[in-house]
């Protein structure tokens, strides 16, 4: 890292730490003070209203929701209800996830999000997508501070952002610690986080104690981007935390998860939801807690006209390209199943057809709102794949494929949250997998077939996936020691465009490429019980 960049980072930390208020007398000693913590997570640069899929209450429904202008309406209503007693936060994965974000390295998100008047934010695992320099630049362009207790400059070892912020809200001192995903260097392509280093949860106890003893806060909040299962584990192991506000796994917690005196929540994704925590503070004690997951449906919240204008002005130069029709689908394409999705069946088919291999693999991404039946536009393609990566092919033996699936399934369904890693189950084409989610580690896979035939352990198979920039040359989709690896001149976007041109209108994929023998066909969550009442292994207690 250059001396200039190191200086900029050090200055940003110093300035923000200077903003942290000095200790004052504990507020609310005589009369209880009502406070609202409101937050969003995993916006993924979805600036405009979009189709959203709702399933809470037992009925599946698709409705228009979200958009930054609709978020603005909702948060302003809460601010009017509790003037001066609202803290609005963002739990990360904000500047990645759409064409507008990708084409501007996240800059298109800045003005619309600034219009929301956030109090603070943390970086998510995708904030590194444009590199460390851009991460710091975008954080500096937002009007709210960014905090992260475990993100360091790899060379200087100094924190990139302050570890915490103390905000006085309605006379109540609230200490917020930021904690981002320490798995980023392995989870994302290695080049994304070059120049950065990440610490684990061991940094947190000292900071909690510092907030309580030195800063004399009334409330301690842990704002995380490590996913709900790991956030629950943090609540179980850390002392002195009142609320863990989780992001990353896009989970929708309609009821709080309670661990001792700590509440854990997560507010969905894509700007389709806001999470609201109401509580009172008297004599430095938190009481009367209430959680609400607010669905930002179009029929419940109008768009704020001033913020809508900001979004329109931001997107205006890109609209012709965003609106280009590149295909059609007769059925909705969605990414709302932990095990298999209609959208990713299409994408893995497109990669395999473009490369002419026996097997295609697409990552188990969580991002992208639903694509409704009808025209498929360029904007949809960038929601599906918000980064442009070339295709990479190679040869792998059957035993390598089996080891890959054992490892990937354990990353999704491990009973120990610390073993969870990345997104959802990988999405195959030309291959089917049957597994038991509740089986012991290393024995999850029941059957693998390629081209309809049982997997042969020593046979070589041809495989295509997206290149991960910074990986070893012989690694393909996290499979090491691949033979004859080769990067194609074709990227994933063009592969999908060509596939849509040949196969539109798309019909609903047949599915059942990946089947859990001990789970229902649709699994919406890695945490909550299934409709049959059986908990997915990652659900913990």
Segments and roles (model prediction):
Residues 31-36, 46, 143-150, 155, ...:
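Feature captures C-terminal
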Residues 2-12:
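Bacterial N-terminal signal peptides that target proteins for export
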Residues 321-342:
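Glycine-rich phosphate/diphosphate-binding loops and the adjacent beta-loop-alpha structural elements
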Residues 53-58, 190-192, 330-336, 386-390, ...:
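Glycine- and acidic
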Residues 312-323:
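Acidic, glycine-rich low-complexity/disordered segments
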Residues 10-21:
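Bacterial N-terminal signal peptides
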Residues 27-309, 316, 338-350, 360, ...:
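Acidic, metal/ion-coordinating pockets
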Residues 290-293, 325-330, 393-395:
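Short amphipathic
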């Amino acid at each position: 890292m250059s001396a200039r960049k190191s200086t900029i980072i050090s200055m940003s930390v110093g300035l923000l730490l200077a903003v942290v208020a000095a200790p004052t007398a504990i507020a609310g000693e005589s009369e209880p003070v009502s406070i609202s913590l409101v937050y969003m997570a995993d916006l993924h640069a979805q600036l405009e209203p979009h189709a959203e899929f709702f399933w809470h209450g037992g009925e599946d429904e698709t409705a228009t929701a979200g958009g930054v202008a609709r978020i603005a309406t909702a948060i302003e209503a809460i601010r009017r209800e509790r003037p001066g007693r609202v803290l609005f936060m963002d739990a990360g994965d904000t500047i990645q996830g759409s064409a507008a974000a990708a084409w501007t390295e996240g800059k298109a998100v800045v003005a619309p999000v600034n219009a929301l008047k956030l109090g603070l934010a943390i970086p998510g695992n995708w904030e590194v997508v444009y590199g460390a320099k851009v991460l710091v630049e975008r954080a500096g362009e937002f009007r709210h501070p960014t905090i992260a207790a475990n993100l360091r400059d790899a060379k200087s070892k100094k924190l990139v952002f302050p570890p915490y912020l103390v905000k006085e809200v309605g006379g109540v001192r609230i200490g917020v610690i930021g904690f981002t995903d320490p798995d980023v260097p392995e989870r994302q392509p290695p080049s994304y986080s070059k120049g950065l280093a990440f610490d684990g949860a061991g940094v947190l106890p000292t900071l909690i104690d510092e907030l309580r003893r030195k800063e004399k806060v009334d409330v301690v909040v842990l704002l995380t981007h490590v996913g709900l299962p790991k956030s629950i584990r943090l609540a179980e192991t850390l002392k002195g935390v009142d609320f863990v506000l989780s992001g990353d796994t896009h989970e929708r917690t309609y009821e709080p998860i309670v661990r001792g005196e700590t509440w854990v929540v997560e507010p969905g994704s894509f700007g389709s939801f806001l999470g609201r925590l109401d509580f009172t503070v008297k004599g430095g004690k938190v009481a009367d807690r209430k959680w609400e997951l607010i669905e930002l449906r179009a029929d419940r919240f109008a768009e704020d006209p001033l913020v809508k204008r900001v979004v329109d002005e931001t997107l205006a130069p890109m609209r012709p390209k965003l609106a280009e029709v590149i295909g059609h689908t007769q059925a909705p394409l969605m990414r709302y199943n932990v095990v298999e999705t209609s959208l990713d069946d299409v994408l893995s088919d497109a990669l395999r057809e473009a490369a002419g291999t026996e097997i295609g693999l697409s990552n188990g991404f969580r991002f992208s709102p639903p694509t409704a039946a009808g025209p498929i536009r360029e904007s949809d393609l960038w929601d599906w794949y918000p980064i442009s990566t070339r295709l990479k092919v190679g040869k792998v033996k059957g035993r390598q494929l089996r080891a890959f699936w054992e490892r990937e399934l354990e990353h999704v369904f491990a009973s120990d949250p610390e073993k969870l890693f990345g997104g959802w189950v990988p999405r195959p084409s030309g291959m089917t997998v049957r597994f038991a989610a509740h089986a012991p580690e290393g024995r999850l896979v029941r059957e693998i077939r390629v081209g309809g035939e049982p997997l042969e352990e020593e046979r070589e198979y041809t495989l295509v996936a997206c290149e991960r920039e910074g990986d070893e040359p012989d690694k393909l989709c996290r499979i090491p020691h691949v033979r004859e690896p080769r990067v194609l001149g074709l990227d994933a976007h063009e592969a999908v465009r060509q596939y849509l041109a040949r196969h539109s209108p798309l019909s609903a994929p047949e599915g059942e490429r990946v089947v859990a023998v001990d789970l229902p066909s649709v699994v919406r969550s890695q945490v909550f019980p299934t409709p049959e009442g059986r908990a997915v292994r990652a659900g913990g207690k």
